[in-house]
């Protein structure tokens, strides 16, 4: 029996169920989304440590824009906050970050944070 650990080159995850998780724990939805962002942070660190070359995170779909203005606003605030944190994690772990998708509906400051994240990690 071969017991050698095989590490995949590419792992893709879809962020889904944060609101249901929060509801099950009797928490507001925004805390479920925050927990999802924290899980992504940990996943980025773990993937880098394990030598996973590519990590794709599907984090926000066009359907999410149909949520309440309050929930979308909370998500955008989380994205701005975690873009800054992810920059530190990416630099510390030699990770390159590339956002794929439509940015036109994001606020100017969020787009700038994403651009900075991509630019400052492009050589990793």
Model-derived features: where do they sit?
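Flexible, compositionally biased loop and terminal segments
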Residues: 1-124
């Amino acid at each position: 029996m071969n017991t050698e650990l095989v590490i995949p080159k590419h792992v893709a995850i879809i962020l889904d169920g944060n609101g249901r998780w929060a509801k099950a724990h009797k928490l507001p939805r925004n805390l479920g989304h925050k927990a999802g962002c924290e899980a992504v942070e940990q996943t980025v660190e773990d993937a880098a440590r394990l030598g996973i070359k590519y990590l794709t995170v599907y984090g926000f779909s066009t359907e999410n824009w149909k949520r309440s203005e309050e929930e979308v606003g909370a998500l955008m605030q989380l994205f701005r906050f975690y873009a800054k944190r992810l920059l530190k994690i990416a630099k510390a772990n030699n990770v390159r970050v590339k956002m794929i998708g439509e940015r036109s509906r994001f606020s100017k400051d969020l787009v700038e944070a994403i651009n900075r994240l991509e630019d400052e990690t492009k050589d990793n």
